[in-house]
Amino acid sequence: MFNSLVQLNISPTARVGVIGIGGLGHLALKFARAWGCHVTAFTSSESKEKEALELGANETINSRDPEDIKAVAGRFDLLLSTVNVQLDWNTYLEALKPRGRLHMLGVVPESLDLSVVPMLFGQRSVGSSPVGSPATIRNMLEFSSRHNINPVTEHFPMDKVNDAMEHLRQGKAK
């Protein structure tokens, strides 16, 4: 997430949306907020709305409701997708401002179904980036230290390994 902000030259006044607030997404919220951005969390779970606000989101949007997403058309400079499921990516493209970018951080196992029209006429783009170079990682750690950014973690004792695996399968892991 940090590498994306650096590579894409995201300004502190940018509007950033984070799609999915699990393991990667919760850090994306923290980094974007500390960067100075106005941050919106797209979450499919009402129970995660409060958590998203506590993690740094300025607002939340129900990602299961296409009308809620359509209502924010043209609002975002950057959308960071941390999910590993297929979504209606064209609706998310429409949520971008002209020259906005949909940036994939989660691995979606299928090919993305995208229309070229919103990209062409809005000069929008889709991309992704790796974690970053060792130098970028050092900068990320320094930034994290300065802004007190820590991951949210969960711990299970060894005798609860099966519970931990089920927790992971259900998409509840942090």
Describe the function of each predicted region:
Residues M1-W35:
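Short internal alpha-helix immediately C-terminal to a glycine-rich phosphate-binding loop
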Residues G100-R101:
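Glycine-centered, small-residue-biased loops immediately flanking beta-strands
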Residues P134-K174:
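C-terminal hydrophobic helical "lid"/dimerization subdomain
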Residues G106-Q123, P134-E142:
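Rossmann-fold NAD(P)-binding glycine/threonine-rich loop
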Residues G22, S45, V108, G132:
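Residues in the short beta-alpha loop(s) of Rossmann-like NAD(P)-binding domains
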Residues V18-I21, R33-T91:
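Adenosine-nucleotide cofactor-binding segment
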Residues N90-A95, S115-V116:
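A short acidic, amphipathic alpha-helical/loop segment
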Residues N9-I10, A95-K97:
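A generic alpha-to-beta junction signature in SAM-dependent methyltransferases
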